[in-house]
């Protein structure tokens, strides 16, 4: 007699997660709460304090947003190439994602320079201070993913030189999970920045 499988509760699904998955999701939850708290403080500090001061959103922030959106696309391609067992394309997509992350970070510093040239300093108006604080904390979180990307790149480089390692990579559920978690976290960082960028536009 066949028994219908009862749906698992959210707690049971949580218990069945790999420890790495649990850590990542809890970390994302914690990071999300930090950003929610800071965004709330940003809003209560007076979102329109910079209005009427002849300021504009830094061009570097605009370009960096495009770079991060593009990196989200390349991160998505990683999972597709892994499913195709195409390691060279997987490595290329990961490398492109990493490089776009580096470009994004450099452009963030350029954006801070533009803010300073406009007279918006970290110790000036509260709204101006939050522009630095929120974007800086976002960079800090993104750096963690970029460090992990370097580790994955080194692993993939060794894999291409060893057929056994390649076989293990494409058949090991743990390796599949690591790539999936990387893309999940990267897209999370994309989403956080897009929300911040929208608020930054409103502040000007």
Each model region followed by its residue ranges:
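...captures the hydrophobic TM-helix bundle architecture rather than a specific catalytic motif
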Residues: 1-204
């Amino acid at each position: 007699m066949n028994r219908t499988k009862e749906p698992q509760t959210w707690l049971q699904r949580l218990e069945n997660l790999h420890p790495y998955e649990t850590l990542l999701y809890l970390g994302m939850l914690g990071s999300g709460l930090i950003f929610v708290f800071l965004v709330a403080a940003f809003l209560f500090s007076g979102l329109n304090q910079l209005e009427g001061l002849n300021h504009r959103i830094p061009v570097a922030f605009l370009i960096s947003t495009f770079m991060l959106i593009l990196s989200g696309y390349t991160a998505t391609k990683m999972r597709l190439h892994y499913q195709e067992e195409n390691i060279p394309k997987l490595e290329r997509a990961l490398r492109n994602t990493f490089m776009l992350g580096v470009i994004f970070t450099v452009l963030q510093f350029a954006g801070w320079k533009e803010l300073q040239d406009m007279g918006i300093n970290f110790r000036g108006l509260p709204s101006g201070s939050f522009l630095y604080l929120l974007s800086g904390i976002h960079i800090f979180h993104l750096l963690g993913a970029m460090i992990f990307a370097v580790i994955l790149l080194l692993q993939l480089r060794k894999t291409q030189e060893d057929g056994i390692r390649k076989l293990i990579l494409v058949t090991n559920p743990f390796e599949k999970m690591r790539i999936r978690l990387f893309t999940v976290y990267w897209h999370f960082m994309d989403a956080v920045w897009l929300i911040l960028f929208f608020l930054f536009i409103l502040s000007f």
